[in-house]
């Protein structure tokens, strides 16, 4: 199976790639080169098909601008929405029938109620809005051939673990420095 993974140098991708059957042909795309990333590429641009096989069986779209706060609002939209448009367009060009898209819990917005799959999204940040728009782009791709295309949207909450450098790691460092925090 030929698998294209965007955001291949990221935290989640490193774990996904480790768990994939190594008999697959894995093609990693990212902005920075790592042992996992073979192709340096910006998903805000059209994908260069010349460096890939003619057939891609699965796209795992993990590329995103995600730290919040930390980016200008337009950066979330530029990467997350343009990236979704370019990935789904590429999927159509190579006749890929399956995409896994990693969104976020952020499209639900900040509310104290339990979130379930049927909870109506109400994002209140540029990041959450950009992820919801990217979900809709992926859904539109699937709907253009719903009988043959498979789309899985994953909305993780806080992602952390060994090697993660985000919010949980910062929180743990602050706790070790005896900083008070309130949630």
List each language-model region with its residue ranges.
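NAD(P)H-binding glycine-rich loop region in Rossmannoid oxidoreductase-like domains
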Residues: 43-82, 90, 108
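Glycine-rich NAD(P)-binding loop of the Rossmann-fold in SDR/ketoreductase-type enzymes
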Residues: 75-86, 121, 125, 129-132
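Rossmann-fold cofactor-recognition segment
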Residues: 31-46
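Glycine/proline-rich active-site loop of Rossmann-fold NAD(P)-dependent oxidoreductases
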Residues: 132, 147, 160-170
């Amino acid at each position: 199976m030929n698998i294209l993974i965007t955001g291949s140098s990221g935290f989640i991708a490193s774990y996904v790639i480790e768990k994939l059957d190594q008999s697959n042909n894995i093609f990693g795309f990212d902005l920075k080169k790592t042992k996992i990333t073979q192709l340096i590429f910006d998903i805000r641009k059209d994908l260069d098909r010349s460096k890939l096989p003619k057939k891609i069986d699965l796209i795992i779209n993990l590329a995103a601008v995600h730290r919040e706060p930390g980016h200008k609002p337009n950066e979330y939209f530029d990467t997350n929405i343009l990236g979704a448009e370019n990935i789904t367009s590429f999927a159509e060009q190579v006749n890929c029938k399956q995409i896994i898209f990693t969104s976020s819990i952020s499209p639900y917005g900040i509310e104290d109620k339990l979130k379930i799959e049927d909870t109506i999204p109400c994002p209140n940040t540029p990041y959450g809005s950009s992820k919801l728009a990217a979900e809709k782009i992926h859904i539109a791709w699937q709907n253009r051939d719903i009988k043959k295309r498979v789309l899985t949207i994953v909305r993780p909450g806080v992602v952390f673990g060994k090697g993660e450098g985000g919010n949980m790691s910062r929180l743990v460092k602050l706790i070790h420095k005896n900083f008070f925090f309130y949630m």
